């Protein structure tokens, strides 16, 4: 940040990298190498982790070079949970492990948003992978018609953290219209409140791709709430929201 130049007082106490709270997780849905380089040059100070969305890594040209760029910027990368599910449904878990080793990935997502997976089996994958990786486990369905009651969200998050997950992710997709949100994009505020009563907030990354959703979380839970599925071009705007330097959050931290 440039605050030595600006000398602006009374900014919120923003956590510093490497962060455990106030994480910004970016969703890379197919940036080119040049776009990745430009993105990191402009925004790397405010990015904590990058997800290569769904199965985009499979069709990404120069994938290993892209991963190298992120490594050189000290930003962990993980493959989208849909890719994990694609391996599981084909009974190729060992092949997935080999992929992680070959690509020197340090973080991994375990999800069941597209796949019917018994929760005990999901927790077993988390337990196994957590021996070697930081596991992010995603809770919630990608199906807008499937409503999961709050107690079930909480039970799943608790069990997945107990199994070894580093963070649990509140599902919203890249659209922000399922899971913790209604199809209009409105936050299911009662669900979020129930979750936070039982799950430490620093253990949850809330997928919040829309600005209104980011503002809602920041207004209630402060500048250091973990937010995910942020578009690369929205990283700097989100950081201004976290600091109260945008109209939507101007008076949050005064």
Predicted features, each with a name:
Residues 4-12, 194-254:
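C-terminal alpha-helical cap/extension of soluble enzyme domains
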Residues 92-98, 148-162, 209-223:
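Catalytic cores of alpha/beta
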Residues 21-27, 48-52, 77-81, 108-110, ...:
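Hydrophobic faces of well-ordered beta-strands that scaffold small-molecule active sites
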Residues 34, 57-70, 86-95, 113-133, ...:
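Active-site-adjacent beta->alpha loops and helix N-cap segments on the catalytic face
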Residues 1-69:
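Conserved N-terminal beta1-alpha1 strand-loop-helix module at the mouth
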Residues 109-114, 162-177, 224-241, 245-248:
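Glycine-rich phosphate-binding active-site loops on the catalytic face of alpha/beta enzymes
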Residues 20-34, 53-56, 78-92, 138-152:
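Active-site mouth loops of central-metabolism enzymes
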Residues 39-43, 70, 99-103, 128-129, ...:
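Generic structural signal for hydrophobic
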